[in-house]
Amino acid sequence: MAILGLGTDIVEISRIEAVISRSGERLARRVLSANEWAIWETHQQPVRFLAKRFAVKEAAAKAFGTGIRNGLAFNQFEVFNDELGKPRLRLWGEALTLAEKLGVTHMHVTLADERHYACATVILESQISAG
């Protein structure tokens, strides 16, 4: 395995709360996938949920080395939890196309939050062919 990219992001949760207060659900609609949106709508802590998703998606965009531009959008990165509760990343659209082009075979996600901050790190790996 070879590391293709590493990205980290930290989000101040109060900043997400301020944006939601000013513009309603517009940020959530821009950031969340359809599956994440369904969870956000009924989540007990929607601001914290959105902040954590935002941190993972920013970290992923940094790991890809692109940021959110050139056809990539936040909602093309979907954060979900596996059967053990571990955060995972699913890609759609241009994000998936880019991952395939780069030869990404595995994505590692770590996510943490405390009272004021949410932090995420994403590592992209590629399988090295013997030769």
From Swiss-Prot:
Which molecular function GO terms apply here?
A: holo-[acyl-carrier-protein] synthase activity; magnesium ion binding
Annotated Pfam families: ACPS (PF01648)
Q: Which NCBIfam families match?
A: acpS (TIGR00516), pantethn_trn (TIGR00556)
Q: Which GO terms describe its biological process?
A: fatty acid biosynthetic process
Entry keyword annotation includes Membrane: no
Q: Which GO terms describe its cellular component?
A: cytoplasm
Q: By which gene is this protein encoded? A: acpS
**Per the entry, which co-factors are needed?**
Mg(2+)
Subcellular location(s) of the protein: Cytoplasm
Q: What class of enzyme is it?
A: transferase
Catalytic reactions of this protein = apo-[ACP] + CoA = holo-[ACP] + adenosine 3',5'-bisphosphate + H(+)
Q: Which InterPro entries match?
A: 4-PPantetheinyl_Trfase_dom, 4-PPantetheinyl_Trfase_dom_sf, ACPS, Ppantetheine-prot_Trfase_dom
Job of this protein: Transfers the 4'-phosphopantetheine moiety from coenzyme A to a Ser of acyl-carrier-protein.
Instruction: Return the similarity comment.
Output: Belongs to the P-Pant transferase superfamily. AcpS family.
Highest taxon in the source lineage: Bacteria
Q: What is this protein called?
A: Holo-[acyl-carrier-protein] synthase
Enzyme Commission number(s) of this protein:
2.7.8.7
Mind giving the lineage of the organism this protein is from? Bacteria, Pseudomonadati, Pseudomonadota, Gammaproteobacteria, Enterobacterales
Q: Which residues bind Mg(2+)?
A: D9, E58
Query: Which keywords accompany this UniProt record?
Result: Cytoplasm, Fatty acid biosynthesis, Fatty acid metabolism, Lipid biosynthesis, Lipid metabolism, Magnesium, Metal-binding, Transferase
